[in-house]
């Protein structure tokens, strides 16, 4: 009888202890800037412009196969126009837009990742020109055969007026007519990260 009670007690103790097993700690992956990309699209009444911005650095916190946090830094001095317009690039770097001399970097810090597996919703804080605002967007996450993680957000919509970028905005200059530049611009971000 004592043996039976001892066996039951031991079985209950093992089950109880396994329920309180320490959760695994997230692993920090370093974003490989040379394999990662950021593209942008800005639209106006009469057309659009697009180009690239260089990623300076970043990290992704990964627990199992799930991204749980991280962030990245963007080099605002690297803004390029796909058409190679030096005039446009200079204007985007000027104080009318991103003020790259005074604010050479922007950054995004992940505060929450909803969902698990390949399709997630990312929430975080985007800082542009020293102004930080919350931002949420859909993303996909893939664990690659070589052990790297690829996190992709195909369309991040940013309202530039929230970051005191008002140049050409019809929201502030109603009489601007067909010279208006839309308040929202889009980013597409692909981060490739490794342990």
Label for each model-derived stretch:
Residues 19-195:
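Low-complexity, acidic/polar, glycine-enriched regions of mature
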